[in-house]
């Protein structure tokens, strides 16, 4: 592998932290794909929830791509790690799924904050700004949305309540 002439002021620790975050995002995408396939099953059949989680999976994959593109822009090298199987493939309810998703979003957010800390520690304002502008604000919105959905699914309960939540709330 040849060394790039364009690389400057990009610490190896930052490069490694970006690679870690790429894999965190890909794991989240994989996990959300499991949510999608569960709610798309004929014996579960929450089509709006399935579509909601399919979009969430796609969004996480886009985040990984955005980070990989940034890594290349900074002349770092993207290093992929193995992705584990989904953390959960069955859910007792929409409430269970929203609770699991909220936990995932908080974990992704924590990882992004750690990446931001590495950027700051290595005096890399460009990386810190990239993480803030492209990810952290969006992450706050996602956490709020999942927290709201968790509250709403707790309020409506199982059965008809879940059906109406799927039809009315996730149809937005």
Curated annotation (Swiss-Prot):
Belongs to the ferritin family. It comes from Schistosoma mansoni. Gene3D superfamilies: 1.20.1260.10. One of its GO terms (biological process) is iron ion transport. Fe cation 1 binds at residues 25, 60, 63. It catalyses: 4 Fe(2+) + O2 + 4 H(+) = 4 Fe(3+) + 2 H2O. GO terms for molecular function: ferric iron binding; ferrous iron binding; ferroxidase activity. Keywords: Iron, Iron storage, Metal-binding, Oxidoreductase. One of its GO terms (cellular component) is cytoplasm. This is Ferritin-2 heavy chain. It holds the Pfam family Ferritin. Oligomer of 24 subunits. The functional molecule forms a roughly spherical shell with a diameter of 12 nm and contains a central cavity into which the insoluble mineral iron core is deposited. The keyword Metal-binding applies. Its EC number is 1.16.3.1. Stores iron in a soluble, non-toxic, readily available form. Important for iron homeostasis. Has ferroxidase activity. Iron is taken up in the ferrous form and deposited as ferric hydroxides after oxidation. Fe cation 2 binds at residues 60, 105, 139. Residues 8-157 form the Ferritin-like diiron domain.
């Amino acid at each position: 592998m040849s060394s790039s002439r364009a690389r400057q002021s990009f610490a190896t620790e930052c490069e490694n932290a970006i690679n870690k975050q790429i894999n965190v995002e890909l794991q989240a995408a994989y996990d959300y794909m499991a949510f999608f396939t569960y709610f798309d099953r004929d014996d579960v059949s929450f089509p709006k929830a399935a579509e909601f989680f399919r979009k969430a999976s796609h969004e996480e994959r886009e985040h990984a791509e955005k980070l990989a593109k940034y890594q290349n822009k900074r002349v770092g090298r993207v290093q992929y790690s193995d992705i584990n199987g989904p953390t959960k493939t069955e859910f007792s309810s929409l409430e269970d799924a929203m609770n699991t998703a909220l936990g995932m979003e908080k974990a992704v957010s924590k990882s992004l904050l750690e990446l931001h800390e590495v950027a700051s520690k290595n005096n890399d304002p460009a990386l810190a700004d990239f993480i803030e502008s492209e990810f952290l604000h969006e992450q706050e919105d996602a956490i709020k949305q999942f927290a709201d959905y968790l509250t709403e699914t707790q309020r409506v309960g199982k059965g008809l309540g879940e059906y109406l939540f799927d039809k009315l709330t996730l149809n937005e």
